[in-house]
């Protein structure tokens, strides 16, 4: 008997996540890879720390242990991709791939063409405490309404959209992520979850730049 490839000893404690084999037969831990689209409500915290109130893991309460690829801050809402496929998470988080993430944003005062231009071309944002001093990468910004706009980012700086707006004298009052790469939030209700499957899942793996573990994911 082995646990995660190591010979087991009498009285050894194991968790549900560990792989247990008797000879060559796996009796626990051969989990099917799962990839989920989650509509995170505002107020839920993206953290794996179970001590934190209203954390996303406890909120989701999914039977398989999953984590997120690309967090949303507590006040933001919308699409999270959550999975137990570590290789997919790592690939999605690699900055060099410039993966697209799209948001709908509401601000506290009327949007101007100058605001749209500056947001599109790049904004200088700073935060001494976070050791942040950067000019944001050019991005696609479109005005939707008097106080709302859409923005497509290919980078993930800390609270980037909020900081960009603040630098231009605006305050974000609502921020919803509606798309990550090819996966769209669509009509998924707040707090709801759906599995990403079939061609949508295949395309996600392709865009993430990995095919590792897809045999398990597509069974």
Could you say what each language-model-derived stretch is?
Residues 1-219:
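Basic, flexible Lys/Arg- and Gly-enriched helix-loop patches that mediate nucleic-acid binding at interfaces
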């Amino acid at each position: 008997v082995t646990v995660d490839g190591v010979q087991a000893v009498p009285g050894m404690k194991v968790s549900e996540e560990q792989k247990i084999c008797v000879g060559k037969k796996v009796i626990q831990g051969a989990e099917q890879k799962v990839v989920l689209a989650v509509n995170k409500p505002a107020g839920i915290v993206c953290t794996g720390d179970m001590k934190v109130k209203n954390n996303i893991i406890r909120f989701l309460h999914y039977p398989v242990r999953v984590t997120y690829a690309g967090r949303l801050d507590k006040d933001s809402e919308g699409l999270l991709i959550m999975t137990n496929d570590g290789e997919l998470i790592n690939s999605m988080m690699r900055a060099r791939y410039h993966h697209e993430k799209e948001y709908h944003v509401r601000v506290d005062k009327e949007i101007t063409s100058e605001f749209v231009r500056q947001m599109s071309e790049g904004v200088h944002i700073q935060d001494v405490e976070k050791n942040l001093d950067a000019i944001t990468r050019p991005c696609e910004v479109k005005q939707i309404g008097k106080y709302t706009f859409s923005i497509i980012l290919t980078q993930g700086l800390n609270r980037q959209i909020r900081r960009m707006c603040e630098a231009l004298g605006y305050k974000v009052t609502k921020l919803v992520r509606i798309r990550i790469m090819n996966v769209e939030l669509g009509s998924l209700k707040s707090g709801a979850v759906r599995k990403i499957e079939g061609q949508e899942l295949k395309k996600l793996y392709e865009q993430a730049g990995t095919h590792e573990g897809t045999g398990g994911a597509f069974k």
